[in-house]
Curated annotation (Swiss-Prot):
Protein name (database record): Lipocalin-like 1 protein
GO molecular function: small molecule binding
PANTHER family, alphabetized: LIPOCALIN (PTHR11430), LIPOCALIN-LIKE 1 PROTEIN (PTHR11430:SF77)
Protein family: Belongs to the calycin superfamily. Lipocalin family.
Organismal lineage: Eukaryota, Metazoa, Chordata, Craniata, Vertebrata
Gene designation: LCNL1
Organism of origin: Homo sapiens (Human)
């Protein structure tokens, strides 16, 4: 992950002391995404969490009510070098927006999508993981629904229109 911006007050209060998480995303055959998170704890441990992002009505859109994420979208990406993700969270009666910028590309063999095989190029996103036992890397992949040129440029602080 290259950068994160949000209007979430909890994030703003703790962003200076946060460490990067590792996220492994696995596309499921039904269109959902299985996610495994690993968060470094202050005492050198690792907190793990598994969850599923449920595919929405619009291709490329997901949600996870358990995490209060009502809208997760790939706002802009070239599906090779970078992705800008838009996330909307609703908690305590407030609506918070997040933008997460990812960069990088998977090295070696191209991953295989369960429905599309290896004929489509994913964007593989790497997140450094700061852990007491040494650095490891996590990665996850975003798969385009159909081969398409990059999305048109969108304003950074407005919710993106469906584009996939």
């Amino acid at each position: 992950m290259v950068g994160v911006v949000s209007d979430d007050q909890d994030f703003l209060d703790s962003k200076d002391t946060m460490k990067m998480a590792v996220v492994l995303v696995t596309p499921l055959g039904n269109g959902d995404l299985a996610l495994k998170f690993g968060y470094p704890t202050p005492h050198g441990g690792c907190q793990k969490m598994d969850t599923t992002f449920t595919e929405g009505a619009v291709p490329g859109q997901f949600s996870n009510p358990a995490m209060a994420l009502s809208d997760i979208r790939v706002a802009f990406s070239d599906y090779q070098h970078f992705a800008l993700l838009y996330l909307e969270m609703r908690k305590g009666g407030l609506r918070n927006q997040w933008l997460q910028l990812y960069g990088g590309r998977a090295a070696g063999r191209r991953p295989r999508h369960p429905r599309f095989g290896s004929g489509m190029s994913p964007l593989c996103l790497h997140q450094p993981f700061l852990h007491a036992e040494g650095g490891t890397a996590g990665s996850w992949c975003l798969w385009p629904r159909v081969p398409a040129p990059p999305c048109p440029s969108l304003p950074l602080f407005a919710p993106p229109a469906p584009s996939l």
